[in-house]
Amino acid sequence: MKDFLSISKERYTTKHYDSAKKIPENDVKDLLEVLRLAPSAVNIQPWHFFVGSTQKAKDLILPAIPDFNIPRIADCSHFVVLCSNTKLTDAQMSKITEVEVKDGRYPDHPEIKDTVDSHRKAFAHMHEQLGDFKEWTAKQAYIAMTALLYAAASKGIDSTPIEGMDFEKANEILNLKDKNLQSVMIVTLGYRKDDTNSLRPKSRLSYNDVIESLD
């Protein structure tokens, strides 16, 4: 496996996929596990991921995709619709704490779980009161998206993060409102085909343009 810096230098956003090439199932499982394990603020995990690979699944989501992005969906091996919560109940957040206890996060100090639980809920309620809860949870989905992109690249799998979509239509298709969810983006996955974008040198602003030391 390549080191992370090499992957960062080589990864690019794929424009065209080879529809004949499919991602091995074991690799798909690994990528979905990376999504599940992605970090989030106070471990709140305010997300849900819909995964598709069949023509039936693609046809389902295509009405939410504008013409210029349809080839990405049509020819990819798999796609993931990343969604974030628009609301989280106390019961949902308590479940997170229960899973943490079950996973052995507090073996020596079980009483900590109550403090962690109350702090997590307070943090979520703070964002509700600030009126930016939906934006906050969407930011967490972007963290998961980044993990997915680089995990895919580490396996030689190409990807495209897509914001060019009809979010309201996607919400309707997947019945997200009733699930207290909102669509945030789609990531397509597969293998490149005749993609001139892959031949262009990577271009970013210089180190000094974006990095500034406070030391």
Residue ranges and their predicted role:
Residues 1-215:
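Acidic, surface-exposed loops and disordered segments
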